[in-house]
Amino acid sequence: TGVPYLREAYHGELQRERWGLVPVAQLDSYKGLYFATFDPEAPSLRAYLGEMAWYLDTFFDRREGGVEIIGGIHKWIIPCNWKFPAENFAGDGYHVHWSHLSAVETGSGGDFRVKPDNAGRALALGRGHSIMTVGPDMVADPPSPEVLAYEAQILPEMRRRLGPRLDLGTPIAGTVFPNFSMLRPTSRTIRVWHPRGPEETEVWAWVFADKAAPPEVKRALRLSGARVFGPGGTFEQDDMDNWQGCTQTGRGVVARRHALNYEMGLGRERFAAEFGAVASDYRYSESNHRSFYRHWAELMAEGAGEGANSGLQGSIHA
């Protein structure tokens, strides 16, 4: 542990070996992503990820060499509860038509989100992990000529590496429970949502690209990430306004008296072996939201007695 003025201010008496960082109980990596836990009883990382591992591969291991970070890190603070952005990346494709319509109309984010797509699915992979997909025929990439040409070029390699499941749909966004998210369209971004209390979240965001991608593709992804999903990005501003508004509304006395409706697609999801997940019956569904909050409620209710998380089937209390 480095200590400025150790001799002058502490008179050399501070026992640095006792006051270092608290060590984590487990630390492991998957495809270049590092995960840690303070729980010595937690399952191994690979067991914790389960089927989610393959979906991470579609973002981070689709080409030989994996991915790399392009540029630096963006950090900013949003006055919202951390679960709002986590659930947004987990399964909320429904809001795009109105929240981001102005950005879509400028052409900065692509128009695939507002096109009919009966093949897309919301996939709940257990332990609160979630993925959104679009149909395999949908273009789900930043509207950049360099990126679109590159994606068409590498598709055969991706199919060889990832297998036939890739032909069922294209993963576009997701959340590894609790607070790690990734996004493919409009940019390539990964996020960590750091709670700073119940009403504030610190965002750490990076843009990534395949290591094997040519420089012009990496540049296009970096610019798209800044324009669309940077702290001042067109899509990001819309989302932050929504999350902040939801958090502020949830503070109210009246809001706390009423349940929030999370019934979209309720009872129509099913386990789909081909996806290795509980899949919605349509592209838009709140099945992933329910899975996310169900797992969160179970963790919060541990030791609180039976029935502590009852009533969560189709509604969530503020």
Residue ranges of each PLM-predicted region?
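Short, solvent-exposed loop/turn and secondary-structure capping segments
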Residues: 1-3, 47-48
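C-terminal catalytic domain of Rieske-type non-heme iron oxygenases
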Residues: 25-318
